[in-house]
Amino acid sequence: MVDTSSVSARLEHLDELVTELDAIRDGGRDGYMAQWRTRLAAEHALQLAIQTCIDVGAHMVSELGLKAPADYRGVFESLCPAGLDARLAERLAAAAGMRNILVHGYLDVDDEAVWAALDRLGDLRDFAAAMQRIGESGRAAPEK
């Protein structure tokens, strides 16, 4: 059985992070590029948002008895049998790669790539909606 209260709390945190990232994006590219603190805030919030998706996804994989992933990127593919859209899973796997750069490759962080990621925040919201739906069902979707 999926611990919906734990998942819901994490998804609420994800929503707060994405809302802040939306506000940064709404400030415009020029302001983003000109302000080191804004870029730093975006990088950190994006890292936390992606990590939250990974954590929720890993929890769901475990609770639903799905195939254990080999790495963070694989968490999203493992959720496809439970009903996560495969195209969304691919985009989220790429986001996990961005998270790795934000965590480990701080000298290699590309401001343009982070800015571009702010245009894909809908993927994080779509993931949250899918996890809410799958969590409420409490079981993996049947294999097709």
Locate the predicted segments by residue.
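Solvent-exposed interaction patches of small proteins and small membrane subunits
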Residues: M1-K144
